Amino acid sequence: MANGKYAARKLKQDRQKHRWSDSDYARRARGLGKKSDPLEGAPQGRGIVLEKVGIEAKQPNSAIRKCVRVQLIKNGKQVTAFCPGDGAISFIDEHDEVTIAGIGGAKGRAMGDLSGVNYKVEKVNGVSLIELVRGNAEKPVR
């Protein structure tokens, strides 16, 4: 390895070459995160509810977390989204239009005991799901 007085260019070239061994760098440089992301890099996305599903929590927890299968409008991809709040699933029906966002897990992945669920429902037919759960708003009839 070059260590001399005028070795800066060689040191820089070697560093740039070996950076590609780091999988995080390689994914970032090639934009693979955005390519594989159903929302295509956007912070939120709209979709149509296909069905309600109950997903079992991972060990040591024991629960059935209420989620929905959503087909995104922009590209037709299907994702599972969590419905946060007590009784929130009752405000969501099939064929409703929902707005989803990332659930906030580490490195943009799943959160807590919900494996494979990377998104949460934020709005139902344009009304905030939290407002519906609290009783501050009513769901509009479509």
Swiss-Prot record:
Residues 11-27 have a biased composition (Basic and acidic residues). PANTHER family: 30S RIBOSOMAL PROTEIN S12 FAMILY MEMBER (PTHR11652). It comes from the Archaea. The keyword Ribosomal protein applies. InterPro entries: NA-bd_OB-fold, Ribosomal_uS12, Ribosomal_uS12_arc, Ribosomal_uS12_euk/arc. This is Small ribosomal subunit protein uS12. It comes from Natronomonas pharaonis (strain ATCC 35678 / DSM 2160 / CIP 103997 / JCM 8858 / NBRC 14720 / NCIMB 2260 / Gabara). Part of the 30S ribosomal subunit. One of its GO terms (biological process) is translation. Keywords: Ribonucleoprotein, Ribosomal protein, RNA-binding, rRNA-binding. Belongs to the universal ribosomal protein uS12 family. One of its GO terms (molecular function) is rRNA binding. GO terms for cellular component: small ribosomal subunit. With S4 and S5 plays an important role in translational accuracy. Located at the interface of the 30S and 50S subunits. Residues 1-44 are annotated as: Disordered. NCBIfam families: PRK04211.1, uS12_E_A.
